[in-house]
Curated annotation (Swiss-Prot):
Keywords: Membrane, Mitochondrion, Mitochondrion inner membrane, Repeat. Pfam families: PPR_3. InterPro entries: Pentatricopeptide_rpt, PPR-containing_protein, TPR-like_helical_dom_sf. Required for respiration. Stabilizes the mitochondrial bicistronic mRNA encoding ATP6 and ATP8, 2 subunits of the proton-translocating ATP synthase. The keyword Repeat applies. This is ATPase expression protein 3.
């Protein structure tokens, strides 16, 4: 709480950044009509035909066993075009000492519980804070800008359509930056294009390849920054560092956004369990920032706050930030609140006491904290308040819905999951994402095998398709399929599916409030829907209903075995398909890449 008081005092003395925002909207549709697309020469089909069936043996078995060997070769080929740079992944060795790692982990676990070690850690933390502040102050401009201007770009969060065609950049060089931006910021669900092994990653590697003479003069700092952002979102931090090195080698000066992204990578990487603190890496980037003459902004200061590990350091940091930067923004306040163990009530009090607008991130943080505190009713009231009164601040998106859906899915509450989905979709006009439907499948599975399990499962599938999402295989959907296939004695009829359509879409919170005691507070029409879902309190279930409402763990062992075998078969089919696709790339990467681009009409063929 001392940190919050320090923050309140700093806010009262210093200004608050209110930048003038200039926004440019960049959607995939900009590249679909009237723009000449790139062409590739026709390739020999015989060279790139992959085998019709691939057994997991021989060369394929080696690929499966080693996993990353192909990726390593691709990385080495890419980096070999940068001979002047010393990069560790040019020569990757299999020298990981597992026994040493175990010893270091046990040693770290023992020393962390030592009081002497904790004192040493605190002293080291405060020494790091002093050095961190020295570098940040050196990088901060002395000129105070009361009304900074900030240019932002707006991209679609996700798209279920194909990637826009690749423009011919020799004829339209001005499109290069925006095209890289779309590939990096919009998640293309079609054919898993934006996954780490998808086509987007291959396209970025191709467009930024050191030997690509067409795009070399078009690569600005923004292009490199967008690429760093893409690999950061996939936790490929090594590629981020390599792009940063390539950027400097090709003569492009990094800017403030570049270093902010690299520091953000360190924050994300620090959440992964390891024995070494990220202090040296943070200081390296700040020294590099100073050497390049790049100024730190409020985002740099906000990002670096995440590396502080004790209350004294945090309070000192806030005071120094107020003195040298001169202003704060709502994102910094959010970072302070997120890094502390504060209740939702404390977070809202800080905003009210300082007359700060509530941002989207802070709003979602409060909902998350309320749900962790088991205050479901209060969290749902806050969600309704956000829809009614905070429209000028931000628009609710799928993340707001998914905070609730994750809680309901973990508890197996299909009733509350459908109540939340319908309320958010129909009342709050929130568009779901793929994670939303995965939580519906999960809630259904954890609710157990009920009489109408198959009808509800089919309803979720139809609902997902109607929202523009294909029926992609996922963990909880496959698990639900296996339960219905082997654990349900009832056959799926059109009548039961039609009944599900009529009932389930009408389960809506009357006053925008969710409650764990939904059965007790429901009227007769809602109870009819809850009965259909099999969500009846245990004490009110009759014998037959209780027998129908079986959890998967209570099924006979032979049925459980059949379900496991079914899921393993689905997994094996997916693995085999992915392997066959990979085999074409292993045989000839360039030819297979061109073939896929042509087949998907991302490029033309001459």
């Amino acid at each position: 709480m001392n940190t919050l008081r320090c923050l309140t005092q700093a806010l009262s003395k210093s200004g608050r950044e209110a930048p003038k925002l200039y926004q440019k909207v960049i959607f995939p549709g900009l590249f679909r009509e009237g723009i000449p697309i790139a062409n590739v020469k026709k390739v020999d089909e015989k060279i790139i035909d992959s085998p019709t069936s691939t057994s997991v043996n021989g060369e394929a078995k080696k690929i499966v066993r080693h996993g990353v060997k192909y990726e390593r070769e691709q990385v080495k080929e890419y980096l070999s075009s940068l001979p002047t740079l010393t990069l560790s992944r040019k020569q990757i060795r299999d020298d990981y000492d597992e026994e040493r790692a175990k010893r270091m982990y046990m040693f770290s676990k023992q020393t962390n519980s030592s009081n002497k070690f904790q004192k040493l850690l605190t002293a080291k933390s405060q020494e790091f804070t002093r050095e961190l502040l020295t570098l940040l102050i050196d990088c901060t401009s002395n000129e105070k800008n009361s009304g900074p201007e900030r240019f932002t770009r707006k991209f679609l969060k996700f798209s279920n359509d194909e990637i826009p065609p690749l423009p011919d950049f020799s004829k339209n060089p001005q499109l290069f930056e925006n095209y890289i931006g779309i590939l990096s910021h919009t998640k293309f669900n079609f054919r898993s294009s934006s996954k780490l092994n998808g086509i987007v990653r291959k396209m970025l590697r191709h467009l930024l390849h050191p030997t690509n003479k067409t795009t070399l003069p078009l690569r600005s700092a923004q292009v490199y920054n967008d690429s760093i952002y893409f690999f950061s979102e996939h936790f490929d931090f090594a590629s981020c560092r390599e792009i940063f090195a390539q950027m400097k080698a090709e003569g492009t000066k990094p800017n403030t956004i570049t270093f902010n992204l690299l520091l953000r990578n360190v924050v994300k990487n620090s959440h992964i369990r390891k024995t070494k603190h990220p202090d040296d890496e943070v200081l390296f980037y700040l020294r590099s920032m100073r050497n390049h003459g790049v100024f730190a902004d409020v985002i740099t200061w906000t990002t670096c706050y995440n590396f502080l590990r004790d209350e004294v350091s945090r309070q000192l940091y806030i005071v120094q930030m107020g003195e040298h930067l001169g202003n704060f923004n709502v994102n910094f306040v959010y970072t302070v609140l997120r890094n502390g163990d504060y209740r939702a009530e404390d977070c809202l009090k800080v905003l009210a006491a300082n007359s700060l607008p509530i941002s989207r991130k802070t709003f979602y943080l409060c909902i998350e904290r309320l749900l962790n505190e088991e205050q479901l009713e209060t969290a749902s009231k806050l969600l309704d308040y956000g829809f009614q009164h905070l429209k000028s601040n931000f628009k609710l998106d799928s993340e707001a819905m998914n905070h609730f859906m994750r809680v309901f899915a973990n508890k197996g509450r299909s009733d509350l999951a459908f109540l939340c989905y319908n309320t958010c979709r129909k009342i709050y006009k929130i568009k779901p994402d793929s994670q939303t439907f995965e939580m519906l499948f999960k809630a259904l599975v954890r609710n157990g095998n009920t009489k109408n399990f198959g009808a509800v499962l089919q309803y979720i599938k139809d609902l997902k398709v109607s929202e523009g999402f294909g029926l992609r295989t996922s963990y909880w959907r496959t698990k639900a399929d296996s339960i219905f296939k082997f654990g349900s004695p009832n056959t799926l009829s059109e009548k039961s599916i039609e009944k599900a359509r009529k009932l389930l879409g009408n389960l809506i919170a009357s006053e925008g409030e969710f409650s764990w005691k939904i059965w007790k507070e429901s009227d007769s029409s809602q109870k009819k829907i809850l009965r259909f879902l099999g969500c009846i309190p245990t004490t009110l279930r009759c014998t037959n209903t209780a027998q129908d409402h079986q959890k998967p763990t209570n099924l006979p062992s032979n049925i459980s075995q059949k379900k496991r075998e079914y899921r393993n078969r689905v997994k094996a089919i997916a693995t085999k398909a992915a392997l066959e696709k990979r085999m074409a790339y292993i045989k000839d990467n360039d030819v297979a890449f061109k073939k896929e681009l042509v087949k998907r009409r991302i490029v033309g063929e001459v």
